[in-house]
Amino acid sequence: SSVNFLLNEEMFKMFLGAFFINLFDPQILFNDGFYDLVDVRIPRGTILKPIRPAALSSRTHLLSRIFDIMSGVLGQGSPDALCAAGFSDSPHFMYSGYDKNGEWYQLYQIGFGGVPGRPAGDGPDGHSLWPAFTNVPNEFLEAYFPLRIVTYETIVDSGGPGLHRGGNGLSLGYMFLEPGEISIHDDRWLSHPWGVNGGLPGQRSDKLMVRADGTREWMVSKCDR
């Protein structure tokens, strides 16, 4: 899977301005007064400005890493507001096929993770990258798709330890009841979310498939099976 994300410089300015306002003066109204104060240059041929025919994908992964980088850069100039890195991802899971009645099914689910520790306190556990997202109840999934949810819990001590620990990640286990195909589009498989001011890194993500015959396979972060 590709990891390129074509990002417009003006959009990057908007991200940066929203970050400034939320970080330094969250009581004021959002406005465009910061636009003329910021100069953004994204070099051609980079992961944020790929050149055709480079494939585009992973928008959510790159967006979250940009937020981490902005937080780290701005935090160096304002140490009292410095945050660690979070799970910085929007894990996508897909399961599709035909059920026993020959009806097509297709599940598309977005996963949650640990939000970074911050000066105000510990990071929240099992949270979406997007503030307004909520989880789909397990009972709904089991009623409408040929699967069972066997695990749905936070991963104890998976957030980076420190004065204000990082939020714990989420463990989600599926039992598939019908043959089908699964796709995973995730990140944080190789790199740990970093800590700051002496705080330690958090845990990476992993994916394990256990087949009906008992064989086990550790899967990469982006794959189809």
Where are these regions (language model features)?
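Glycine/proline-enriched, intrinsically flexible loops and inter-domain linkers
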Residues: 1-225
